[in-house]
Amino acid sequence: DGARPGDIIFRDVNGDGIIDADDRVRMNKTGTPKWNGGMSIRMSYKAFDFTALIQGAAGAVQYIRTESGDFGNYFKEFADERWRPDPSDPTGMRPDPNADTSGPRAFQREEEYWIANANTFFLRNTDYIRLKQLEVGYNLPPGLTTRLGIQNLRLYANGFNLLTFDNFGLMDPESRNQAGHYYPQKRIVNLGLSLSF
């Protein structure tokens, strides 16, 4: 009842020709990763030093509850890939052949029968690997620093949250917020020096 062009099409799991509660299946994944891991690397060569922290998680999913409707906005992905009618079709029943219509039509969240219950269309894999921290340093030669009256001078550059590899795309895969209402982790880059007298 109430189906319109551009709605999500559900699979008739039990094959009775009716889409109803009997077609629901259990989802064994949650928002909690099954695996968390990380690796710390520390190396030095002559006057150079290098430190890195790589972390990741796998086995979790995130259900996207977009704030579509009168009081919110779509994620860009949903807007760009939404179903659109063919402008040459007066009935508005055929999809636009020139548009990427891999998603459903634009919708009001509170009015759609297919958004009221969780479904796999809005479920996203949150597996990721992130370069959480990276630092490269250089200690000036002691012969140079002692002439300047300095015991040690180290120049360094470091960064945090520099790279993230994931297929999630909509928001930070570490976030547990389903609609993106949070401050994302900042990408930070520093240049500095440390002195010892």
Predicted regions and their residues:
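Acidic carboxylate motifs that coordinate Ca2+ or other divalent cations, activating on Asp/Glu
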Residues: 16, 20
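Outer-envelope beta-barrel architecture signal
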Residues: 35-37, 46-48, 127, 149-153, ...
